[in-house]
């Protein structure tokens, strides 16, 4: 009996799909809403970036992310779950021209997660840790959903009909998985994590404005001490340090993309004193703004400025 070719062919692996579709170095968006692919051919220096709520998978290679004092490495058998927007440091650990680093991330829609949490209230596990970042084992069902999402790139005519269904399936599987409580806490209006997530999104939008912690705590119906405690539990940073990270990372993006000089960048992100800006810039990035700019362009690193998850973030939106 002859086996039809369509049945005989093995479905492509995630590595094969990303090899085919992640054709450019750095980050690239795709025709599938919320799906982004990444390719690198060399290990990288640490990159300061803002991760938004998402799941991240590595098909080939390894990556390291740092949140506060914690370092998390992940590879092909792992899943990185980001439940709130966080300023992080990330670097590629393993990559070469013969064996490139291949990865992807899928944006998580809080509205979808919230709807699923209401629709399936009995299936979510306990909340567990408040931390907004975790590396966990990649479950086969989650891997299968992500694989089918990426395979839609082979049949773009099916994306409008099938992508929303697969994204819903992925959200459900994450919600009922080992870290589902973390996602549920993100969207439960009465929960502390949701209140902190609301404050974080406000900080991301208003990073260049004066920080008034007392008012922010009142706005999310928390005491100042409780707000500080839960904010650090979620982000590993105090509200002030969180805002400084956002400001300095946006200033760095402005400098490296040549959209502003040092003084202009410092004022645009909310600093009143360029000298204070330069001191804090050196403390975070290990070099003064001018030294960093020279080093960046001399090292041919300008092309690594991509988009959310893998780049210096653009906080203008």
Language model segments and positions:
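N-terminal regulatory/effector-sensing and dimerization cores
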Residues: 27-124
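Basic/polar phosphate-binding segments, predominantly the helix-turn-helix DNA-binding elements
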Residues: 169, 173-179, 186-188, 204, ...
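…primarily DNA-binding HTH/wHTH and HhH modules…
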Residues: 253, 257-260, 268, 272-317
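A short, N-terminal "cap"/entry segment at the start of jelly-roll beta-barrel domains
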Residues: 1-31, 35-36, 44-45, 126-131, ...
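Short, amphipathic alpha-helix enriched in basic
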Residues: 198-209, 236, 250-257
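N-terminal positioning helix adjacent to the helix-turn-helix/winged-helix DNA-binding module
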Residues: 138-141, 166, 188-199, 235, ...
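Residue at a beta-strand N-cap/secondary-structure junction
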Residues: 64, 71, 210, 259-260
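Amphipathic alpha-helical segments enriched in hydrophobic/aromatic residues interleaved with Lys/Arg
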Residues: 2-13, 113-169, 173-174, 179, ...
């Amino acid at each position: 009996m002859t086996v039809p070719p369509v049945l005989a062919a093995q479905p492509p692996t995630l590595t094969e799909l990303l090899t085919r579709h992640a054709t450019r170095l750095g980050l690239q968006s795709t025709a599938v809403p919320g799906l982004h692919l990444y390719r690198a051919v060399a290990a990288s220096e640490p990159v300061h970036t803002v991760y938004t709520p998402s799941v991240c998978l590595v098909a080939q290679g390894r990556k390291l992310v740092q949140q506060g004092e914690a370092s998390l490495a992940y590879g092909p058998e792992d899943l990185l779950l980001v439940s709130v927007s966080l300023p992080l440091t990330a670097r590629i650990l393993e990559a070469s021209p013969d064996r490139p680093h291949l990865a992807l991330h899928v944006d998580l829609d809080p509205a979808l997660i919230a709807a699923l949490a209401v629709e399936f209230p009995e299936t979510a596990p306990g909340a567990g840790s408040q931390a907004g970042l975790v590396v966990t084992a990649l479950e086969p069902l989650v891997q299968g959903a992500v694989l089918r999402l990426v395979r839609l790139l082979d049949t773009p005519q099916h994306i409008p009909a099938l992508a929303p269904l697969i994204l819903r399936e992925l959200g459900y599987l994450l919600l009922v998985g080992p870290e589902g409580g973390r996602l549920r806490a993100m969207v439960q209006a009465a929960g502390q994590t949701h209140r902190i997530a609301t404050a974080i999104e406000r900080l991301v939008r208003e990073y260049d404005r004066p920080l008034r912690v007392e008012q922010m705590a009142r706005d999310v119906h928390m005491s100042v001490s409780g707000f500080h405690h839960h904010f650090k539990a979620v982000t590993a940073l105090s509200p002030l340090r969180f805002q400084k990270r956002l400001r300095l990372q946006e200033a760095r993006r402005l400098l490296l993309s040549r959209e502003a000089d040092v003084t202009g960048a410092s004022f645009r992100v909310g600093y009143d004193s360029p000298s204070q800006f330069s001191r804090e810039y050196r403390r975070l990035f290990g070099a003064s703004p001018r030294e960093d700019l020279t080093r960046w362009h001399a090292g041919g690193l300008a092309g690594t400025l991509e988009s959310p998850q893998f780049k210096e973030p653009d906080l203008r939106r």
